[in-house]
């Protein structure tokens, strides 16, 4: 029984140290992200097409911020009225080998000027590829909530 408890403790410790998440946000100099209220999703995503489900989950996380999702037609109308609109370029990469790792990068551009406004990145490493993705997604979600 004591041996089982020791193995369980060791297994729990191994899981704890084997799961790791990081995230960061970088902003263009002089840009006030608070003035942006809207976001337009387009076809700006790169990476493995097998990861489109993760890209969709990232879009859902962006939708869960204070940003309102609109169409490009509506964006043009709002811009003409002095509103500011963002458009994200989403990149997801999952390493299936070498211990695995998932990286999510969102590059937010001003929809009107195409100026890079902010880059938000996260990464996750866990026990499986799916676990890596969930860790990276949770990390990017938290950073998005902080920024928007």
Where are these regions (language model features)?
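Alpha-helical context
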Residues: 30, 34, 38, 43-45, ...
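A structural "domain/chain start" motif
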Residues: 8-11, 16-67
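Mid-sequence acidic-hydrophobic segments that form the walls
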Residues: 7, 109, 147
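Surface-exposed short loop/turn segments
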Residues: 64-65, 70-131
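Generic recognition of short, well-ordered alpha-helical segments
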Residues: 53, 57, 101-103, 135
């Amino acid at each position: 029984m004591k041996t089982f408890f020791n193995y369980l403790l060791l297994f729990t410790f191994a899981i704890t140290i084997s799961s790791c998440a990081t995230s960061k946000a970088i902003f263009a100099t002089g840009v006030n992200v608070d003035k942006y209220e809207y976001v337009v999703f387009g076809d700006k995503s790169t990476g493995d097409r097998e990861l489109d489900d993760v890209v969709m989950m990232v879009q859902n996380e962006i939708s869960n911020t204070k940003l309102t999702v609109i169409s490009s037609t509506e964006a043009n109308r709002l811009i003409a009225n002095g509103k500011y609109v963002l458009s994200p370029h989403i990149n997801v990469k999952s390493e299936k080998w070498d211990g695995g790792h998932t990286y999510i990068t969102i590059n937010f551009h001003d929809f009107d000027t195409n100026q890079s406004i902010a880059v938000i990145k996260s990464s996750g490493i866990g026990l499986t590829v799916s676990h890596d993705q969930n860790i990276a997604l949770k990390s990017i979600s938290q950073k998005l909530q902080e920024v928007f």
